[in-house]
Amino acid sequence: MHKAKNCIITCIDFRLQKAYADFIASQGWLGESDLISVAGCSRDLVKPLSDFHKASLLRQIELSIKLHDPDTIIFLDHQDCGGYAQDGTIPQGLELDEDKKQHTAYANKVKKLIHDLFPTREVKVYFAQLEGKVEEL
């Protein structure tokens, strides 16, 4: 088995690709982690539009665990996320503090869900600002 440090889930939003890449590299995770990219990042687990979306993302995480045994499952959510906004879950255009506050509430839900499903894995959720700053929630 090839061992990965992490399974990292990001949003597909092109505006954050550089911030994600820079952050992943700064943590020493580049080339050491499985990468999954879906619209809304953690949203499909905490407020899926359909059961398919949740099952699909969980399947990718399960495959990462089965194939590469990552120690940590990491979600990189972000400010002004269209994936979260598609049904108004977290509206776009919020002030940064309010956006981060709402993401924090969902981050706590995704941490619990992943911990319950995969209790031997550490779970972390980060929040990327549009200008590139990334912080743990």
Q: Regions from the language model: what does each represent?
A:
Residues 78:
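Acidic/histidine-rich, metal-coordinating catalytic segments
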Residues 1-20, 41-53, 65-72, 82-137:
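Divalent-metal-activated hydrolytic enzyme cores
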Residues 31-41:
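A short beta-strand-loop structural module common to alpha/beta enzyme folds
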Residues 22-29:
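Short, solvent-exposed amphipathic alpha-helical segments in soluble enzyme
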